[in-house]
Design a protein with these regions (language model features):
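Alpha/beta-hydrolase active-site loop
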Residues: 122-144
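Short, surface-exposed "cap/lid" segments of acyl-processing enzymes
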Residues: 45-49, 53-94
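Primarily recognizes the serine-hydrolase "nucleophile elbow" in alpha/beta-hydrolase
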Residues: 140-146, 150-197
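Catalytic active-site module of serine/aspartate enzymes centered on a nucleophile-bearing elbow/loop
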Residues: 362-366, 371-407
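Conserved alpha/beta-hydrolase "acid-adjacent" motif
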Residues: 332-338
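Accessory cap/linker subdomain of secreted extracellular hydrolases
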Residues: 181-316
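N-terminal cap/lid segment of alpha/beta-hydrolase-fold proteins
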Residues: 12-48
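Short beta-strand/loop motif that positions the catalytic acidic residue
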Residues: 325-327, 331
Length: 411
């Protein structure tokens, strides 16, 4: 595997007067004329070689920081205001300050602030493309003079957890550890069913069905911000027939449904509409461009549906590659059961060194969250401490199976 890259001179990270990090901007050649920007984060002092970490994104049009929100300029002070969530920036900064070389890269077709630079490249990206991109990034990482190529870790978040396991299998002589944060065990089809059907139905049953009769008010559901975040525009989801309070059938008029007393059946109507909506996402319309900002790109989605589940892939990771799984118990995108399934599979195949750490109040971004929605903010420091501690553990490499529940109160 050979990847071309273009480098600039290392630059000190100008965030304070006393610098602890320097970095080098790179351009990675992904093949077929496609290039992407990357950044190598290094300790400010020393030439290495440093243990290396590659960060592999979750789904969607992610830049190298996995930015959740937009960078903007304060009109009064002129200072840069960063968005509340930049999980890969948090990881890169924390680890490089503590002696690691960390490589981040933008997804193909994507630039800073998850800007789509090339809609054709991004809209036609497949799961295999993204896996190959991670392989190219790994190739570039181990070529850097400051990197210890005998100590390489892959950190995947969400969709990235399905990629790092594959890259590890393909590069057994290079990869030493993999870390899975907010992990996939099942195929994205099952993950999508949880996000788009099971979770909204559970919310409707537990929160909106006040009379416990299996019916919810269209008006209340439409005005509920959590439910709207889960299902989108309820009027569009429902489409046609609905059931009123007295049991008669009415035609839902999208223009007026917010102001009437219409009720719908959670199981007989809402669930079927949510299933139909989920199926429609994977329909590929010839010539239609996809941004992936609101809905997933159909080409990417269908490529995922045909992929082998991570639960089957993980069992093939070589026994000398250590595995860490970090999981928030309030993850509303990849529920904690996914992490338990991976841990059970690793135990079944007798993988000698795997660890699962769960966090009671954290969501998919490892920030405090409810069980329904992902809170947006910086990764909690105790998660970063756990990650660094595991990577720095001198006794790893011996037979070690660990399941921990961690919280800020334990610190």
């Amino acid at each position: 595997m050979s990847s071309l890259f273009y480098a600039t001179t290392p630059t000190v990270n100008a965030q304070s007067d006393l610098q602890t990090i320097k970095y080098r901007n790179l351009v990675i050649d992904l093949g077929n004329g496609i290039k992407t920007n990357a950044r190598l984060n290094l300790p400010a002092i020393g030439d290495g070689p440093f243990p290396a970490v590659l960060l592999v994104h979750g789904s969607g049009p992610n830049d190298m920081n996995e930015t959740g929100g937009y960078v903007r300029i304060d009109n009064e002070t002129g200072s840069i205001i960063y968005p509340p969530a930049r999980p890969f920036f948090d990881i890169a900064e924390y680890l490089s300050e503590r002696g690691f070389a960390v490589l981040q890269y933008d997804k193909r077709g994507i630039g800073a602030n998850f800007t789509i630079l090339d809609s054709n490249v991004w809209g036609n990206a497949t799961f295999d493309d993204l896996t190959q991109d991670a392989e190219r990034a790994l190739d570039v990482l181990v070529q850097q003079p400051e990197v210890d190529s005998n100590n390489v870790t892959l950190v995947g978040h969400s969709e990235g957890t399905t990629i790092v396991s594959r890259v590890a299998i393909n590069n057994p002589g290079i990869v030493d550890n993999i870390v899975m944060m907010g992990a996939f065990a099942q195929n994205l089809r099952e993950i999508g069913d949880f996000q788009g059907v099971s979770l909204p139905i559970l919310y409707a049953q537990q929160v909106l069905d006040h009379n416990h009769n299996g019916l919810i008010s269209v008006q209340e559901a439409s005005e509920n911000p959590v439910f709207s975040s889960l299902v989108g525009n309820l009027t569009l989801v429902l489409a046609q027939n609905i059931t009123t309070v007295n049991g008669t059938a009415e035609q839902l008029n999208p223009q007026y449904n917010i102001n009437n007393d219409t009720f719908i059946s959670i199981i007989d109507e809402l669930k079927h509409k949510l299933i139909d909506q989920l199926k429609s996402l994977s329909v590929v319309t010839q010539g239609e461009k996809c941004s992936g900002l609101k809905e997933p790109c159909p080409i990417w989605l269908t490529s995922h549906f045909s992929s082998i589940p991570n639960l089957d892939i993980i069992s093939k990771v070589p026994s000398d590659i250590s595995i860490l799984i970090l999981q928030g118990k309030n993850d509303s995108q990849t529920p904690i059961q996914q992490a338990f399934l991976l841990q059970q599979k690793l135990t079944e195949v007798r993988h000698p060194d795997h660890t699962l750490i769960t966090y009671p109040d954290l969501g998919h971004s490892f920030y405090p969250s409810s069980q329904w929605l992902t809170g947006i903010g910086p990764i909690q420091e105790y998660v970063l401490q756990d990650l660094f501690g595991w990577l720095s553990d001198p006794v790893r490499g011996f037979t070690k199976v660990t399941i921990l529940s961690s919280s800020s109160q334990m610190r």
